[in-house]
């Protein structure tokens, strides 16, 4: 602990200094061989990092990561295991989707999750095809099924300001908005690509990162495309490839 304390203090002081100057920090999940979660400054200099499990334990990608209000970091160490760690890398919470709440023996992988204001954790279980909410002890508090017909191949998911939940499904390439209380579909948009990310904007439109479509699209509630960038970014030499948000 004598070794760790100066390091932790340095990280905290660094983060505080950046916060005081209103400079942006970036939380990074680097995977597919990198296997690291890190906090960097706007220049890319690493202020803090944590090595993760990596392919040797069946995990090849960090598809979601969050810094929590308490300063801890919530990430997934394998396709099925979520962990919350402190800046001194102590695991303070862990949940294994593969062996919990009826999933044993089933194929399940996780690409999206979030800590809720009530302290529970919402997890989207791809393949199993459901969204669950578990408490700090891993007890199932709420769940609803994803829409049948291919939407169980879920990727990124995010809550809206209305409290509904946007879930992206690579196949059949659709963004679906659910009422989290009963799992009813309240809106969807078929983009016909391996769509990866979507978020609801303040104006009520939905920004969609099309994944394999190499594009970013803004659509209205009436499902009309109001803005789009595809392929090459106008006025630059930047070519869009696999897109997420």
PLM feature spans:
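Generic early N-terminus positional signal peaking at residue ~5-7
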Residues: 5-6, 151
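Bacterial N-terminal signal peptides
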Residues: 6-16
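Histidine-/acidic-rich catalytic cores in large beta-rich domains
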Residues: 21-245
């Amino acid at each position: 602990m004598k070794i760790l304390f100066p390091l932790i203090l340095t990280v905290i002081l660094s983060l505080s200094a950046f916060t005081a100057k209103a400079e942006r920090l970036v939380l990074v999940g680097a995977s597919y061989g990198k296997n690291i979660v890190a906090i960097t400054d706007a220049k890319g200099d690493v202020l803090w990092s944590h090595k993760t499990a990596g392919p040797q334990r069946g995990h090849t990608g960090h598809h979601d990561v969050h810094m929590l209000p308490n300063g801890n970091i919530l990430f997934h160490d394998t396709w099925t295991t979520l962990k919350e760690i402190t800046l001194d890398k102590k695991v303070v919470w862990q949940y294994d989707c593969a062996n919990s709440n009826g999933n044993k023996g089933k194929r399940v992988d996780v690409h999206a999750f979030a800590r809720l204001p009530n302290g529970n954790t919402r997890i989207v279980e791809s393949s199993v095809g459901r969204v669950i909410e578990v408490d700090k002890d891993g007890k199932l508090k709420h769940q609803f099924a994803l829409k049948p017909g291919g939407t169980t191949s879920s990727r990124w998911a995010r809550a809206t300001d209305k409290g509904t939940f946007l879930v992206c499904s690579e196949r059949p390439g659709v963004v679906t908005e659910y009422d989290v209380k009963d799992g009813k579909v309240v809106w969807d948009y078929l983009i016909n690509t391996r769509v990866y990310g979507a978020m609801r904007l303040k104006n009520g439109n939905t920004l969609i990162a099309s994944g394999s479509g190499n594009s970013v699209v803004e659509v209205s509630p009436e499902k009309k495309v109001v803005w789009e960038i595809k392929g090459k970014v106008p006025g630059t030499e930047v070519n869009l490839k696999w897109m997420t948000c």
